[in-house]
Amino acid sequence: MLRYILTINLLSDMCCGSGVGNGSSQDIISSYDNYGLPIIYGRRLKGLLRDNAEFMANFGYIEKTLVDRVFGTVSSPGIIRVGNAQIADAEEIKSELSDISKDISLNKIINSGNIEEVFTVTRTATAINDEGVADDQQLRSFGVVPKGVKFYSEIEIDVNTDNCAEYRLLEDVCKSLRGIGLNRNRGLGRVECFLQATKVKAYENAEIEIGSTEIEYIIETKDSVVSTGDYISGSSLQGYFINQLLSKKLIGENEVQDCLSKVIFSNAYICKKGKKYLPMTLGMFNIKNDKDSFYSIIDGYKMDDGKQYVKAKGYYCILDDRIYTADIKNKTEFHFSKKTKDLYKISAIDGGQTFTGRIYSDNTEFLKKILKVINNNKGIIHLGGSVNAQYAQSSITIIKQDDTPKDNDNNKNNKDNYNNKNDGIKAKDGRLIVEFLSDTVFMNSIGVNAVDEESIKYNLCKILGEEFSIEEIYTETVKVGGYNSKWKAPKRRYLALKKGTQILVKIDNLQEIKEQGFIGFLNSEGYGEYKVRDLLECNEFDWEEDGQDAVKGARIDKAKDIISKVCKNLAERICQIRVVNNFDNETNLSASTVMRLIPAFKAADMDEKKGFMDAFISYVSKNYKGENNKGIRDYSNKIIEEFNKIDSRIANKYVKAEFNNNKNEMFRTFLQAYITQAKLYYKEKR
């Protein structure tokens, strides 16, 4: 696998259309990410590169089979992966923008909308009829990314050397890419592209301890990961690693079934700020319209008949009798197929989130081979669908013992190791709680998929023994299945107990119990993970937001220029609003006075020696002398006086600093707004 960076330099404005407008000033806008930074999605880039390759094939420069081998077909994914193209240092900028929540003053003004304005200029166009005259009601505006911006996309190609036809094709199609986005045959979207080898980042190979039966990891999604759920499923991890083991010849076809049966891939759930979250238990409730308190019914909380309760949702972590909750950021993307003319949507887990899970096996050799895959790929993995463009790229980090995220309080006594038999269970009054951490598929005594109480008890006997009774069950049922990418067909669907299911049992004779492990069917894909615990002494929990108090001084380095431009734009907007608000009182303003401001404005704009404000004052004093010009002098002084009042009206310290650091530009905006407003005033008056 070779990795390269495709650099895209905009030689003209570009509208890499998202298919929507902003609803007010622009009919079509370019594509931006969640932070407001411009982006060229990988699917678009890959399509453009393929168009160039097919153009070369149609004229006989290359074979069509080479194009299909590199870019893929309907039945074959190809050997190339094209990542999203972003501006330089995009990841560091996003990290700093996330930290802005710690600074109260910045947090109020830095948002995706204001950042988009930094990277957007407005262009307009209209339709011309056969007589060469503009049609009525046909004016359209476009939000475009200005020329000069550079984008960088990571491209991976599954070859061992650059001295091959596949790499030469990639290099040629990148060099021949000349236009991107809307109206690229009418001046927009002219680009210059070149390919260069990526710098190899330092990577510390992960190792497994002798005799260890598990690997614990953290996955950080770099791109969005195609998924219909809000977690990374064990089946997607299983599919990725099995394919990698086969392609790298670490296992043979005859070892696949052995690997599938002996390696368990758990689901990976959200992990934030050192806290490991689990699916919300189905016995946890809130009072309706009150999300600040949580009540665990199965742990003994008695519902008040005068209150209405609803099931809690999301993911949770309990620490020190406080409950923390986490929501997963999901997104829906719409795409258009050029060949079939179909509009379709893709559901995905948003990038920039972390998930943690484990891989278990009694066969250490399989775990070593999985680690070898991770190390060979420098910790980069691709999960979910559409792995060849735009989606799927993530990083995986193996957790050492000292780096393990905090477990929930109701699990803190567990060593939390697969196959470990712990002695932490007390079973007060002989009662225990079994919780399912993932969807669980059960077969009854005759091998038929079932979720009735008898089937549940039949399967629980394998971990609790024969002498127990079920007292309470909090559960829901779901249908689980999947898709077999090798056979291009859906898998069989099963009825399962939903993750978060809780079962209260009473054991007559407590014996050694395996407190955590897997039960039921399809364990290798993450189904059936469970834990056994005692009833909690506390069954009411206060909710605490998983965040940090806002503090001053957020870390800003790479995002400094962007934040400065946002503050400058806001300062200019304040100047313009100030003009509009003041102009209602300009009832005695003559048209000649306004028109005489225009040459003063132009002269100040062309003066390269003096600042704009000084040049304007100098021009007025030199050219508008005498009693006849008193009106224009007084009006100019009034404009300057009103401008000087703006400083005291700006509340935000960052915007005020930008206003004072760019007073000449601010005054130019202020004066231009006065002239524009005056023209509109006299146009309406006529």
Spans of model-derived segments:
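Conserved active-site/ligand-binding neighborhood in enzyme cores
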Residues: 1-686
